[in-house]
């Protein structure tokens, strides 16, 4: 009777089995960082990848809204300076909050992808933080653009100039950031539901 063990050199190409990759990993005791990140990205659930991309998009548009609104100063005795309008100042403040939040969340997602562990210990706690944070930021962005849009529309009826165009552009960027944050909140809600059910 012959033993029925796995055939030697079965061609598996992973870090734990035979093959060139296994030999390379065994030589120095580690897997190359670039390969490790790519493998973790492929193993991440589609929802987690979608959330990372949506947060990156929200970060980009929040940053654009912040920059455009902060630079919206065109003189004329202060009539065309954003900081003379509380609605625009509020929109700028919310854009700053959105940039800080999405920066922290994207950094956290990249850390999890790179190192294979989350900075928040409990999975359910992390899911609650994701869902609550995305919901709050999406609501704040919507409230900011809802406050600034009527003022811009009223001023554009009297005069359509660079100041009102810049304000409209910043509001549009905030709206796109809201859409991305809202979709990210939906994904976070799905992840939270899965954690609670499982």
From Swiss-Prot:
Binding partners and assembly: Homodimer and heterodimers.
Alphabetized UniProt keyword annotations: Cell membrane, Membrane, Transmembrane, Transmembrane helix
Protein name (record): CASP-like protein 4B3
UniProt family annotation: Belongs to the Casparian strip membrane proteins (CASP) family.
Subcellular locations according to the entry: Cell membrane
Organism: Oryza sativa subsp. japonica (Rice)
Membrane topology: Multi-pass membrane protein
Transmembrane feature ranges: 52-72, 86-106, 125-145, 167-187
All ranges on the Cytoplasmic side of the membrane: 1-51, 107-124, 188-198
One Pfam family matching this protein: CASP_dom
Positions with biased composition (Low complexity): 16-27
Cellular component terms (Gene Ontology): plasma membrane
Spans within the Extracellular topological domain: 73-85, 146-166
Spans annotated as Disordered: 1-27
